[in-house]
Regions:
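S-adenosylmethionine
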Residues: 131, 137-254
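Class I SAM-dependent transferase core
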Residues: 1-22, 36-93, 99, 115, ...
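Hydrophobic alpha-helical segments in the ANL/AMP-binding
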Residues: 82, 132-133
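Conserved SAM/SAH-binding loop
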Residues: 127
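Conserved class I S-adenosyl-L-methionine
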Residues: 115-124
Length: 254
């Protein structure tokens, strides 16, 4: 797929509102020259996303990874939503986040975690979304893709191998069998069947003071907040170019 077209389709999702400075390969900190649009994606990242899409389209003809067949819709519906979450979860991108005093005090726990290599789990990863796009945005994370469907797990290994991604582990079993003594710093989950059951499983994987990020429909907002009272929820963020999708992030209390 044409790299310029991918960048154009993804731009609405990477445009962080306000005057925040994004220090990342994806969102450079240098201001754009007058009359020029910022280069939101590096050539390497565009190539990786393009290759990822090619693999996804090819495998999707054999196994059901997504009901979406149009490559451009795959970019907006899947990669756009995933990178929107990535920009908000890791606003420093490839840099190790530096917490301000205000952000430290907002964490509902007395201890501050080491953010040098956050442990991230993507539950029910399927086609690798949002986990792998988050990894492309924040390559310093250690990512675990949890997918019990063996064919989909094989696909995830193929993408990881082809893109030469490090610190990515594919766990081909149910999350309930995953041994996580200290939990994950971040767990991601997109809208799934049996939402109430699965979101409870996701919450149990989150370490104290860790985060749970849900890409869900607005109809599931109240349900998530009610089921998980042990989390301090941020205001939900509307996903661009969507009438009903939101990003909901909660911090787990110690």
């Amino acid at each position: 797929m044409n790299h310029a077209r991918i960048a154009e389709l993804l731009q609405p999702f990477l445009g962080i509102s306000g005057n925040a400075v994004i220090s990342s390969e994806l969102c450079p900190s240098e201001p754009a020259e007058a009359g020029k649009k910022p280069a939101l994606l590096s050539p390497l990242q565009l190539q990786l996303i393009s290759t990822y899409i090619d693999i996804l389209v090819r495998w999707n003809a054999r196994i059901n990874l997504t009901s979406i067949r149009d490559p451009e819709e795959i970019v907006t519906r899947h990669f756009g939503e995933s990178l929107f979450a990535a920009c908000h979860l890791f606003p420093s991108g490839s840099s190790v986040p530096r917490l301000s005093q205000a952000s430290v005090s907002s964490v509902p726990c007395s201890g501050v975690k080491d953010f040098a290599r956050p442990r991230v789990a993507d539950l029910g990863s399927g086609a690798g979304l949002p986990g792998l796009p988050i990894k492309l945005w924040a390559p310093h994370i250690a990512l675990t893709l949890i997918e019990s469907n063996q064919k989909k797990a094989t696909f995830l290994r193929e993408v990881t191998r082809t893109l030469i991604l490090t610190d990515v582990n594919v766990y081909p079993d149910r999350a309930e069998t995953l041994a996580t003594p200290s939990g994950f710093d971040l767990v991601t989950l997109r809208a799934v069947e049996r939402f109430a059951e699965v979101v409870s499983i996701a919450a149990r994987l989150v370490a104290p003071a860790g985060r749970l990020a849900l890409l869900i429909g607005t109809s599931q907002l109240h349900q998530a907040q009610t089921i998980l009272p042990d989390f301090s929820w941020q205001e939900p963020l509307a996903v661009p170019i969507s009438h009903s999708r939101i990003l909901l992030v909660g911090h787990r209390y110690c």
